[in-house]
Structures are given as structure tokens and as C-alpha cells.
Amino acid sequence: MVSRQEQFEQVQAVKKSINTASEEVKNQALLAMADHLVAATEEILAANALDMAAAKGKISDVMLDRLYLDADRIEAMARGIREVVALPDPIGEVLETSQLENGLVITKKRVAMGVIGIIYESRPNVTSDAAALTLKSGNAVVLRSGKDAYQTTHAIVTALKKGLETTTIHPNVIQLVEDTSRESSYAMMKAKGYLDLLIPRGGAGLINAVVENAIVPVIETGTGIVHVYVDKDADEDKALSIINNAKTSRPSVCNAMEVLLVHENKAASFLPRLEQVLVAERKEAGLEPIQFRLDSKASQFVSGQAAQAQDFDTEFLDYILAVKVVSSLEEAVAHIESHSTHHSDAIVTENAEAAAYFTDQVDSAAVYVNASTRFTDGGQFGLGCEMGISTQKLHARGPMGLKELTSYKYVVAGDGQIRE
């Protein structure tokens, strides 16, 4: 096993091969990575079978689905890499140019961060997405996968590095930390001088640990306590469709809905219809029904467990939905502000004034009017695959694509000027 220190030194030694690579060279490397990923399908699936067998009974079925790979999912991962090829190269982009009275020409241009560390949980697709985005944005990457997905991740990284071996970019620009202990995560948090940026992708425990302990700059990809508010002027059919999609299409992802707020004027008519869609119809179709966690008012209209206070602060990542009846739009917004992780929140309403109030007052990275929160995604936003959803305001916010993985510098051109 290569030590963490050796890996940090290796990636530092070769980072210039990617930091200054041309767009053509990077695109050739990405295509080679995608081809070798597909070529290694058999090996990756064998590794994934080991991870799945080890994880069964230890994590929920929803989380097992995150971990699971088949040939179609591997092909989708390769397709995601190829889509990054089609994106414009951000490196070298001129952001601003100005000329001072003394003749100095100042150009602000986009540059690579350098080396980016990614700590993430059991999601194999993050491995290929992170490698593709960091490479296209001119960065080397150090990956630290969750233990549950390590065999799969190792097989994926092996394939990606074999692809790089056929190009002029050194394979060591992609590093996988072999130690999956907690100590390896803390070592990355303290790797100042080796990592220029650290991005955690996972649950609240992981993200909080990184934010609280890292001395390396961090972009926080926050958890998603995602709200949908059904206003008194909502179209109920739209609301049913939006909630069904936001909650059930992929409950294990961070843009999935976790909390429903319903105006009291809508509760009696809307909540029984919602129960029919999310519970009865799903049972009839052989699908897992949604389990409601209901406040006292909501429990008057539908069946479910009584909500506890923590239910409105929980990212369930499962077929569970907390439901609260509110007396006004203002109460809904106040609830969101008290419990939000500032990820994605939505209002369903036909009232333009209510929509404007909601979008102005809710302080989240993505705020929706009459649409599912599942659209908070780099691919859906036209950014290609993403590094995560930033819930902070400094440097990056919302889906992080290529530009969010870069910095800038000033190039000052003169003709012998000196400062008087």
C-alpha cells in the first residue's frame, strides 16, 4: 500500500502535466478514460459484486441502489465523461481586461486550482464524474471513497488510469487513497500544501467533520433537507406530479424532497389525494409506499406516524416524508429558514405575488416555482456532470461544474513602468 504522504507527493510531482495541458490533450485523455472504463466493465462489475455482498444487511435498500452498478450504469458513467469533452475548456478564459492610465494592461484569466481532494461515500459514479471534471478543469485529483464502495472504486480508478497511460497526461494525476479508515480522511483535511481544495460529498456527518476540522480550503456540498410548499393558490394536479417526482424518483439523492408544507386551506382536499398517489397507488403497483411523518394538523387528513421535532431536520434519503400544515406563506418561509440546509426548495402556486415572495425570501442555492427540486443537477442545468451541489456562498453555489473548479490570476503587461 502506498502511503498517503507518498500519494500527496506523487500528485504534486505530476500536477503540471494537467494544470497546463491543452484542451485537445485533455479531451483525448477523457475519451481514452471513457473507452477504458467501458472495456473494464467485467472487472468493475466483479468488484461491485464484492461490495454489494459485503454491504447487504448493513445499509438500506435505497443506499444499496446507490452502490449498485450494471453494464448500463457503467455505460452512463462513460457517457458522462464524453459529455465533459463537449464542454468548453474554462482554462485560459479571459474574464476581464483593463488598461490603466500609466499604460499597464491588466488581464484577469481563469486558471486551475491545482490539486483537488474529494472525500465521498458509497457512490461509484462520483469517481468517474470527479475524475472527468477535475481533469477538464486542469486539476489533479486525490479521491477518498467510502469503505462500502472501495472495491468498485479501485476498479474504476484502475480503468481510468489505464486510459491515461495511452496519453501524454501522467496517470498519477488521479490518485485513490487506499486507506479507508477515518484517519485517512483527517489526513486529507490537514494536507495543506498538498491539496488546494477539499470537497466532501456525503451525509451530514461527513460534511460537518470536514468543515469543522479541515485546514485546507473547503467547498461545502451540503445535505438536502429539501422542502416543497403547496400554497393556497396551488394547482393540485401540478403539486401531485411535482411531489411524486421530487420524493419517489430517487429518494437517496440530495435533491430529493424531504419535507412537505401545505397551506391549511389546501390540506383537507390535497392531502388525501397525495396519500392516494404516494401510498395506495404505489402499493397497487408493487412499489414501496411513502411513510408519512405528520404534524398534528396533517394527521387529521391522512394516516401516518406522528412527527417528532427531529423529523423536520432529517435528510431521510428514503421513502419517508415529513408533513406540516401551515397557516400562511409567511409561516412556510419561516419554517424553511429555520430548518433549511439551503440546498433546494420549491413553491407550487398560481399566484405570481406568492411566487415572488418565496423566491426573494428563501435563501437556498436553487429556488423553484412549479417544478420538481430534482432538477438541481449539473447535467440538468446544462453544466455537464457535476462535482456536487454547493450550499455555501463563497466561491461556488449550487451545482458545481467546470468553472467552479477553477480560480483566476491577474496578468499585468507593461513597457517598463515603475511605481512612483
Swiss-Prot record:
Q: Which Gene3D superfamilies match?
A: Aldehyde Dehydrogenase, Chain A, domain 1, Aldehyde Dehydrogenase, Chain A, domain 2
Extract the InterPro entries matched here.
Answer: Ald_DH/histidinol_DH (IPR016161), Ald_DH_C (IPR016163), Ald_DH_N (IPR016162), Aldehyde_DH_dom (IPR015590), G-glutamylP_reductase_CS (IPR020593), Glu-5-SA_DH (IPR012134), GPR_dom (IPR000965)
The record's Gene Ontology cellular component field reads: cytoplasm
Report which superkingdom the organism of origin falls in: Bacteria
State which Enzyme Commission number(s) the record gives: 1.2.1.41
Q: Where in the cell is it found?
A: Cytoplasm
Mind telling me which SUPFAM superfamilies this protein's record contains?
Answer: ALDH-like
Name its pathway: Amino-acid biosynthesis; L-proline biosynthesis; L-glutamate 5-semialdehyde from L-glutamate: step 2/2
What biological-process terms (Gene Ontology) are attached? L-proline biosynthetic process
Tell me what reaction this enzyme catalyses. Answer: L-glutamate 5-semialdehyde + phosphate + NADP(+) = L-glutamyl 5-phosphate + NADPH + H(+)
List the molecular function annotations (GO) for this entry. Answer: glutamate-5-semialdehyde dehydrogenase activity; NADP binding
Q: Which UniProt keywords apply?
A: Amino-acid biosynthesis, Cytoplasm, NADP, Oxidoreductase, Proline biosynthesis
Which HAMAP family does this chain map to? Answer: ProA (MF_00412)
Protein family per UniProt: Belongs to the gamma-glutamyl phosphate reductase family.
The protein's role, per its UniProt record: Catalyzes the NADPH-dependent reduction of L-glutamate 5-phosphate into L-glutamate 5-semialdehyde and phosphate. The product spontaneously undergoes cyclization to form 1-pyrroline-5-carboxylate.
The record, for PANTHER family, names:
DELTA-1-PYRROLINE-5-CARBOXYLATE SYNTHASE (PTHR11063:SF8), GLUTAMATE SEMIALDEHYDE DEHYDROGENASE (PTHR11063)
Its protein name is Gamma-glutamyl phosphate reductase
- This chain is encoded by the gene named proA
